[in-house]
């Protein structure tokens, strides 16, 4: 029986790679995002029988609900939700940060994620489906300038554990996956398009790729139904935990 996955933020990075991985494994993929041309390219590459695009802003609940209401029958029964859409904005410490960027991160990484989850929960419970939430190592290991971004990802981690508790006995699997350095458009978005900053961050670091995470997501999704990965932290070998910072006199 063919299963269906809905992937938010499927126009680039982890989400785009996941769409390729799941379609390649025989899943039907509902790919969501704001950039219609990117979603059209996915359909062209993977086929309309495998991928159905939904164009909307993840923070626009009315647009989301309208798009979901128009799903073709063969894509309507969703077995897996991958909450991937998210972003970091700004690199400044809290006293210099832009509060509007903070609000956008909370709206995208927290509010939109919980709203999408709530919207799909009845069907996921009925089908004993699964939810995979993309958190970050920033939820556990703070760094300068990661203030609100790290806080939103810590929320995702705790929300995932709370869902596991709430859904106990209903057969729904919930996973929080917490990736470290991965080369996507993440830094370009965070720095408002600073290509040099992005190149510097990843240069020589041998970071993870979207494909690495996509294969991990597929592995989790295809585990036997009696197994649940609660949390999974994954980094490139080149990355480790940040050391404690010390401010010295003089």
Give residue spans per PLM region.
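Conserved glycine-rich cofactor-binding loop
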Residues: 11-12
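Conserved glycine-rich Rossmann-like NAD(P)H-binding loop of the short-chain dehydrogenase/reductase
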Residues: 25-42
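The beta1-alpha1 cofactor-binding region of Rossmann-like NAD(H)/NADP(H)-dependent oxidoreductases
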Residues: 55-66, 99
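Substrate-binding pocket helix/loop in short-chain dehydrogenase/reductase
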Residues: 92-94, 98-104
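Active-site helix of classical SDR
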Residues: 117, 152
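Residue(s) in the substrate-gating loop at a strand-loop-helix junction
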Residues: 136
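C-terminal helical subdomain
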Residues: 176-180, 195-243
């Amino acid at each position: 029986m063919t299963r269906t996955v809905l992937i938010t933020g499927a126009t680039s990075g982890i989400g785009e790679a996941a769409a390729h991985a799941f379609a390649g494994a025989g899943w039907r993929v509902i790919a969501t995002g704001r950039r219609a041309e990117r979603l059209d390219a996915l359909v062209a590459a993977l086929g309309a029988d495998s991928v159905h695009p939904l164009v909307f802003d993840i923070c626009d609940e009315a647009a989301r609900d309208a798009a979901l209401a128009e799903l073709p029958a063969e894509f309507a029964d969703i077995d897996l939700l991958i909450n991937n859409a998210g972003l970091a904005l700004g690199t400044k410490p809290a006293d210099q940060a832009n509060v509007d960027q903070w609000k956008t991160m909370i709206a995208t990484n927290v509010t939109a994620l919980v709203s999408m989850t709530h919207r799909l929960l009845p069907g996921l419970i009925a089908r004993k489906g699964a939810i995979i939430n993309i958190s970050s190592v920033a939820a556990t290991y703070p760094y300068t300038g990661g203030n609100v971004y790290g806080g939103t990802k810590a929320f995702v981690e705790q929300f995932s554990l709370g869902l596991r508790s709430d859904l106990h006995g209903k057969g729904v699997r919930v996973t929080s996956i917490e990736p470290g350095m991965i080369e996507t458009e993440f830094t370009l978005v965070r720095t408002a398009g600073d290509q040099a900053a992005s190149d510097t961050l990843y240069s020589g670091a041998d970071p993870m790729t979207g494909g690495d995470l996509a294969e991990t997501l597929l592995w989790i999704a295809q585990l036997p139904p009696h197994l649940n990965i609660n949390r999974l932290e994954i980094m490139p070998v080149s990355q480790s935990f940040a050391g404690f910072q010390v401010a010295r006199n003089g």
